[in-house]
Amino acid sequence: IVGPAPFSTTRAELRANADALRHEALVLEAMPDGVESTLPTKVEWFCFPDGAQLQRRRRAPRPRFRTFVMANAGQRTFGVCLQSHQRAVCAPAADGVEAERSLWVPFVVCLLTRLPIIESLRRWLQRVVWLLPADGTQTASPSLRDAITALLFEVPQPIPGALRVSITVPGCADARGGGDGDAMVEFAVPTIARLPPLSHRLWPLLRQFGPQALLELLACAFGERKILLHSSTLALLPSISEGLCALLYPLQWPHPCIPVLPRALMEMLEAPQP
């Protein structure tokens, strides 16, 4: 679980300083216990690429999903994030005036894996969104902890092209958002005898770029040109960049590829290599 570093502020300070709404992100809790030392370096930057930004709204923002990819020494780590918000407790302003809008603090439940099972993990998170803590503690509730523990230790790893794993997530809403019944989620890895398995779907790439623009992108990639993708929707960037790399098969992109670049790493855009 990733969220903003502890902070203390008043409503008057928030009204006077917009920067007070943005805080550095920290790993608040990791499961299983003791795994903090093996987490990828600065994984919290990728959970909150633009920093942990508080929001002033009358109602809580809707939960949002996003993904990221980290590479180190040829090993790729996929991250699937579910961002939700909790109401913050603010110290009263000196003038005693209460703001009409509540202050909402973001936190992220992030699942890390080296298997290309992004969509399966996304569906799993969609089922457990109802288990997120609602008391403002920003720690895993007992029900959420039990669900994550079962996913980590009781589910066998799928075998490419041979073993598909289906698990039941109890006590969650069904696909229509109603009820309180069980939900089934399937994990599968394609066989290695075929094309490399895709970590993301190709349709966002095909939808966002027409044939001409896609051909120009592929020409730049084959020519090892620097490619910078910008979008106001962070969830699109991993799908587009991973899809573009997949279309290079049987060749591979030999240079660093960061689908979502955190604000803290912006200086990497000045690097001379692609």
What are these regions (language model features)?
Residues 1-274:
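UDENN/dDENN subdomains and adjacent acidic, S/T/P-rich linkers in DENN-containing trafficking regulators
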